[in-house]
């Protein structure tokens, strides 16, 4: 995997092929379809990068808006052993970079049933709080944050 620029074509490709867990999350939190959610996220971000898989296909986009870090992806994001390894290694470097750039704690909300994301967030050093109602649907989400 490698970092690439989040062009319009990349945004469309990831938005139209978003993994189910991320689609559910953006619908419950903001009542948005995947393409609209990822487009708005990219446009509002202060820092933004896209992720290309080993096969050259975009598999995700991540960014930070104010102090809110986010990642939306396709099933390709974790489809191979190589992708999973890079996501863990590069993910930690990305979060460290974002913390340095923002200069304040960063965090966001994750749907409580999105167990893979919660496990990954903890691996990246985030504190994940207990579920509470959040967003458009009032579904249970866990706030997560990291200060250093």
Locations of the language-model features?
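Conserved beta-strand in the GNAT
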Residues: 50, 55-70
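C-terminal "cap" of GNAT-fold acetyltransferases
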Residues: 134-148
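Conserved acetyl-CoA binding element of GNAT-fold acetyltransferases
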Residues: 65-86, 142
């Amino acid at each position: 995997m490698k970092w690439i620029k989040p062009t319009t074509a990349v945004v469309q490709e990831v938005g139209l092929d978003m993994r189910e867990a991320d689609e559910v999350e953006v619908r419950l939190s903001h009542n948005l379809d995947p393409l609209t959610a990822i487009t708005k996220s990219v446009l509002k971000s202060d820092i933004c990068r896209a992720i290309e898989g080993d096969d050259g296909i975009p598999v995700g986009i991540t960014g930070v808006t104010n102090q809110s870090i986010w990642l939306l992806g396709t099933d390709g994001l974790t489809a191979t052993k190589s992708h999973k390894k890079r996501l863990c290694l590069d993910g930690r470097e990305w979060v460290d970079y974002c913390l340095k750039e923002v200069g304040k704690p960063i965090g966001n909300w994750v749907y409580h049933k999105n167990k893979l994301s919660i496990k990954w967030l903890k691996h990246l050093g985030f504190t994940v709080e207990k579920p509470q109602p959040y967003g458009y649907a009032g579904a249970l989400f866990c706030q997560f944050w990291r200060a250093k």
